């Protein structure tokens, strides 16, 4: 079939398998160009199919020559209907890993469930024995709690007062004002249950109980802080409470791994175009201004550049891992530079529908968004008849 982007709001309903494959190849080429990283050799990535999780898997495999197991929840293709991009990404990743002689297997299912944890445990026992590095990179709006059976939904809302600020429809470029009502009832509790650290902790406990964690094993989860302008809806909102919980969980996991010399860290990453961030009001406008500044300064990074820097300059330098005063690894350091934030804050005040094409990088935003779904890559023949029915080789 001829596959074209079909949009509904901030979601693209189609994905292009050849474009997703090109995306993987581009990321692998970048990692290889930066040279070998003396890092983990047996890596589990929970949330391995898109964004930072996918980039972590690529960096582990093609930077460190690691064997990788990836867990994700993606939709395979059906006749005439494309798969989700993460499915095509994972299929392409496994193919490239196989060509390079690297072990790569995947599990498709709900990572919050006991069943998927058990499947993963069985696979590690059978194939790898133990794990050196566990990356936890889940972004889900819902979580079916494995113990209580309750379905929890996360919300992106401010706490205490309505938040009003600018936002942009990144398809049309229209800048408008948006008001978001504050959370109520169980909103905070539900958001913490979905996006906090409980499931991360459950994964580590399950792996440790089965003796699947190597000595000095490391686990990393990802977080975001961001600027003042997004604070009310992000870091000081419901999602911020979940991130606080995630960050606190790193310390309790580290305590539980003391007998193995293991450590848990949260890495604070930069703002990037992902399916998750596109859904958050205010963030797309901030990102389009941030991109403009960071590109002009020569310090712009995508997911793969961020993960390469995390591995090569933070995790695996041979020295102690540098952290901030709250024990977090910071690779949002270039985004949060005072000069960058000052410039973004100034542009924020000037941003209108008319000025944004000039002062922001809406084109860069749109391009990155299309790339998430396998569209807009050089060297891909988008007018060609494409087979949507692609398998992930390790998943029957």
UniProtKB/Swiss-Prot annotation:
Q: What is its EC number?
A: 1.3.1.9
Q: Which GO terms describe its molecular function?
A: enoyl-[acyl-carrier-protein] reductase (NADH) activity; NAD binding; trans-2-enoyl-CoA reductase (NADH) activity
Q: Which UniProt keywords apply?
A: Fatty acid biosynthesis, Fatty acid metabolism, Lipid biosynthesis, Lipid metabolism, NAD, Oxidoreductase
Q: Which residues bind substrate?
A: 224
Identify the residue position(s) of the site Plays an important role in discriminating NADH against NADPH: 74
GO annotations under biological process? Answer: fatty acid biosynthetic process
Lipid biosynthesis among keywords: yes
Reaction(s) catalysed by this chain, per the record, are: a 2,3-saturated acyl-[ACP] + NAD(+) = a (2E)-enoyl-[ACP] + NADH + H(+)
State the active site. 234 (proton donor)
Q: Which residues bind NAD(+) per the record?
A: 47-52, 73-74, 110-111, 138-139, 243, 272-274
Q: In which pathway does it act?
A: Lipid metabolism; fatty acid biosynthesis
Q: Which InterPro entries match?
A: Eno_Rdtase_FAD-bd_dom, Enoyl-CoA_Rdtase_cat_dom, FabV-like_NADH_b, Trans-2-enoyl-CoA_reductase
For whether the record's keyword set contains Oxidoreductase, the answer is yes
Top enzyme category = oxidoreductase
For this protein, the record's Pfam families field holds:
Eno-Rase_FAD_bd, Eno-Rase_NADH_b, Enoyl_reductase
Which family is it part of?
Belongs to the TER reductase family.
Sum up the protein's function in the record's words: Involved in the final reduction of the elongation cycle of fatty acid synthesis (FAS II). Catalyzes the reduction of a carbon-carbon double bond in an enoyl moiety that is covalently linked to an acyl carrier protein (ACP).
**Classification via HAMAP family:** FabV_reductase
Q: How does it assemble?
A: Monomer.
Protein name per the record? Enoyl-[acyl-carrier-protein] reductase [NADH]
Annotated organism of origin? Flavobacterium psychrophilum (strain ATCC 49511 / DSM 21280 / CIP 103535 / JIP02/86)
Which lineage ranks, top first, belong to the organism behind this chain? Bacteria, Pseudomonadati, Bacteroidota, Flavobacteriia, Flavobacteriales
